[in-house]
Amino acid sequence: RSENTRKAYARDLLDFCQTIYRTTDLRKALSRFLSLSEVEAGMTLTKFRQLLRERGAQPATINRKLSALRAFVDHARKRGIVNWRVTDLVKGEKQRTDPKERIRQHLPAVTAEGIAEALRKVLDAFPERGLQSLRDKTIVALMALHGLRRVEVARLSLSDLIDEPDGVFSLRIWGKGDKFRVIKLVAETTKLLKRYLAALKRAKIEPKQDALGVPVFVSLRKSKGKRLTLTQLNNIVDAALAKAGIKRKGLSCHSLRHCFGTLAATSVPIPDLAAYLGHSNIATTGLYAHAVNAVNPADAVSELVLEAA
């Protein structure tokens, strides 16, 4: 599993320990949990699910936390520590909305035209000059015009930039499970990225190499030169949405990816879009819409968002 998945599981296990055993001592609490009989474990898991409901947790959140516990117990079961399974003891929550409806809840509008207009507002909200503005606009463009995940933007290193003969960049994208794909940027995003890198050099800010390489997007103040964190990317996108006047609950970094997928699916074959987005399951891509006419997904979206401006 990816590092982010492992961290998410650790947070969910910690929540379980704090909620049930009132402690942050993971080792002690989880050992106690694994010592329970099958009946006791079932009662404990049911109690945890009920407390999450009372807390107001969404079905998807409850299911994710139960999934973390299931993975942990399955590992213990393989080692002969327990002989019961979470799956047999507690049921997950039923999703109240279908997957397509969940995507719609994270979109800024209900029509393709409205979504394109919202993305234009976000991209137009950035000042033309300034290193921070260039950095942040480039980040938003990669998510909105190319459908990159937040973690994919964070992991971009200079070695992932491919300068094509026609002057545009292609990017080597490291997605879930350390799988990579190569996508071609549109001219406008390439221009933004080149301007940002040039401005970074003029400001004499040296990106600091880490385990992933030399980062593309770095902090400009505290921890200057270090790779931006996922939290920092959240803050950048939230600020951009607020400046554009469209920020509300449910809109986030991933909303920009949903916008890209929804717009691209109006004119791009699902298999092409799945490859561009890095979906291992084509059914996930199919949630966005039905497709026609084979074109570059990024070209389709940039035409809707940029050329109509």
PLM ranges: what are they?
Residues 1-309:
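Conserved catalytic core of the tyrosine transesterase superfamily
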